[in-house]
């Protein structure tokens, strides 16, 4: 899913760079969700960054032992389509030598368990990826909560 940048002239530049390898981005609205569902029902593969802070909704689930706001989009899509969920990431190699791809075994229970358990399983998979290369994770997402309330000042 893709949200246009605030600087109008950057949109096409960013899209060209990101879609150059054959991927397709969909908007971060209901039409984008419908496009993702359609792709999954056709047996296509989609990619979602499950650690993004949801703009609305979401559920608190453990993440490194602390409650973290977790999107329910991945759980919902997997549950509606019985899609296999595979987690992976691209590790940047030193000296700009490229990337090493890492994939975890599928967790089939993400698509069949209640939302709370599914969210916890998603966060556990994200944790496994982070532990493989913690220095490469973008730690700025404001996912952590205190007693269900946001405590970030900005």
Which residues make up each language-model segment?
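Non-catalytic C-terminal accessory region of glycerolipid acyltransferases
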Residues: 30-154
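Conserved nucleotide-cofactor-binding alpha/beta core module
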Residues: 1-44
């Amino acid at each position: 899913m893709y949200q246009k940048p605030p600087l109008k002239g950057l949109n096409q530049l960013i899209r060209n760079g990101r879609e150059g390898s054959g991927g397709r981005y969909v908007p971060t609205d209901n039409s984008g969700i419908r496009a993702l569902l359609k792709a999954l029902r056709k047996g296509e593969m989609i990619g979602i960054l499950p650690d993004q802070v949801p703009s609305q909704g979401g559920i608190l689930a453990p993440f490194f032992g602390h409650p973290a706001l977790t999107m329910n989009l991945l759980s919902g899509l997997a549950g509606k389509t019985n899609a296999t969920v595979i987690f992976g990431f691209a590790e940047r190699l030193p000296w700009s030598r490229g990337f090493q791809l890492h994939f975890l075994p599928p967790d089939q229970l993400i698509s069949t368990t209640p939302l709370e358990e599914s969210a916890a399983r998603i966060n556990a998979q994200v944790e496994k990826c982070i532990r493989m290369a913690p220095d490469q994770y973008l730690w700025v997402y404001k996912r952590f909560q205190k007693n269900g309330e946001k405590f970030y000042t900005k």
